[in-house]
């Protein structure tokens, strides 16, 4: 593991920082509530990114973790890729979240690439990344059984999300 600061300077670790570090730094700056971030190339989530499809909310497992459809960025232009691929990847993610709350939606699919997932801590980000892959897998299986599965009704989505998140959460163990 390599630790870098928000100026992209290595703080600790023997390895080189990820080529995606600039993207991460941009997201930490744009979304102050983020305390940890994970970038994966998990199979099912990547399949949605490559197919240029957002991940719709079909069930309560999805709603327990994400408040709605997992968003997809637009494609980067050839000029954006040539100019600053990693920086412009951060830019299109931030652009996609212009009207989304990154706390309620801690994941995004980068078009033709892969997911970026975050949380209040590194462990929360990792748990969200696992949840994202699971809901992507469930959505793919839903498509197999029904090419047009119905979306989870909004009132059920909101209930499942709010009972696990926020000041009035009732799901899970009491935090000490």
Where in the sequence are the language-model features?
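Glycine-rich flexible loops
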Residues: 1-176
């Amino acid at each position: 593991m390599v630790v870098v600061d928000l100026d992209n300077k290595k703080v600790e670790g023997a390895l080189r920082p990820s080529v995606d570090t600039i993207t991460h730094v941009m997201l930490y700056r744009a979304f102050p509530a983020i305390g940890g971030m994970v970038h994966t190339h998990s199979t099912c989530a990547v399949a949605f990114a490559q197919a240029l499809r957002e991940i719709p909310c079909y069930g309560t497992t999805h709603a327990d973790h994400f408040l709605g459809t997992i968003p997809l960025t637009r494609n980067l232009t050839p000029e954006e890729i040539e100019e600053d691929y990693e920086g412009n990847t951060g830019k299109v993610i931030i652009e996609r979240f212009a009207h989304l709350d990154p706390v309620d939606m801690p994941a995004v699919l980068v078009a033709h690439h892969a997911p970026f997932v975050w949380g209040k801590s590194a462990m929360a980000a990792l748990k969200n990344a696992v949840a994202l892959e699971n809901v992507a897998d469930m959505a793919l299986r839903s498509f197999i059984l029904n090419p047009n599965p119905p979306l989870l009704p909004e009132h059920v989505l909101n209930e499942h999300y709010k009972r696990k998140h926020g000041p009035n959460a009732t799901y899970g163990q009491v935090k000490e």
